Amino acid sequence: MPDATPQFKQQLREAFDSLQVGQIFTYRRTFTEGDVSLFIGVTGDLNPYHQDEMFAGESWFKRRNIPGLLTASMATHIGGMMGFLATEMTFQYLKPVYVGDTVTCVVTVMEKDDEKRQFFCAVNYTNQDGMEVLKGGFRGFPSDVRLAK
């Protein structure tokens, strides 16, 4: 593998220096049937809780819910805007999310490791009713100076 160019190394330094502990990035979206269909098609997640209204209706969910990783993937939108490459991601699913729900994803830069040139970010997801539906975190490094505002 070839060595990184001096220009790329400088770009990484600038990206690292531009992120600070305490910075917050937010992304909001309303999930649609199309989102679920595309996600199921790409992942092959054929879980009846996501596809079968009758099956899900007889469960404690009372109706179909969207795949948890679809909700969790909102963090990748923010990470992409930050030019962030994750090395680790963890999630805790707290409440179901349904088609039509509007979810807000908030990423907070929590730790900056100057030695490893990595960050740890906390991520929290709330629905339109202000209920926390998912939480987690990710670790990695910025690769670009593009920052979500």
Predicted regions and their residues:
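HotDog/MaoC-like acyl-thioester-processing domains
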Residues: 1-21, 97-149
